Amino acid sequence: MRTLALSLALALLCLLHTEAAATVPDRSEVAGKWYIVALASNTDFFLREKGKMKMVMARISFLGEDELEVSYAAPSPKGCRKWETTFKKTSDDGELYYSEEAEKTVEVLDTDYKSYAVIFATRVKDGRTLHMMRLYSRSREVSPTAMAIFRKLARERNYTDEMVAVLPSQEECSVDEV
């Protein structure tokens, strides 16, 4: 669960990534609360555990020019699990890293910065390369358009319907609670 959450954090951070012709978004467009509402992966852990997963909440804050902090709240069998992770920019445009447990890179496939973002993450750990796609939303209820974009991009990356999970909303924990 921790590695999944850390990968989610890195993906959120890379919402700063833009296409070459696009303008870098204002920090206020990236900062704030996000909900991880859908996932796609072919990893054994995901395929085994996806039915138990619920929506994760995250809050992005800027610590400086090159650092972001992400606070998380995720329901677990032992209650609400909360943690924070700090990410640093690399020399590559639009790339951020967190390397405590594994090498992680992310790519923003599609976003409007206002309501949704589709992220593709790659993680290398113990010589294995793992991939996961995520749909982030500013609200618990993702728009049908954003969900359609996510599903289309998942198919393009060869994820089957069995490899996609729309995460149920949860009220157990929030990044807003102390």
UniProtKB/Swiss-Prot annotation:
Gene3D superfamilies: 2.40.128.20
CDD domains, per the entry: lipocalin_Ex-FABP-like
Induction: Down-regulated by dietary stress. Significantly decreased expression between days 0 to 5 in egg whites of eggs laid by corticosterone-fed hens (at protein level). Decreased expression at day 14 in the magnum of the oviduct in the corticosterone-fed laying hens.
Localization annotation: Secreted
PTM description: Does not seem to be glycosylated.
Cysteines engaged in disulfide bonds, as pairs: C80-C173
One Pfam family named in its UniProt record: Lipocalin
Residues that coordinate or bind 1-tetradecanoyl-sn-glycerol 3-phosphate: Y72, K104, R134, L135, Y136
PROSITE patterns: LIPOCALIN
Tissue-by-tissue expression: Expressed in egg white (at protein level). Expressed in the magnum of the oviduct (at protein level). Preferentially synthesized in nonproliferating cells.
Residues spanning the signal sequence: 1-20
GO CC terms of this entry: extracellular space
More info: Developmentally regulated in chick embryo.
Similarity remark: Belongs to the calycin superfamily. Lipocalin family.
Full protein name: Extracellular fatty acid-binding protein
Chain's gene name: EXFABP
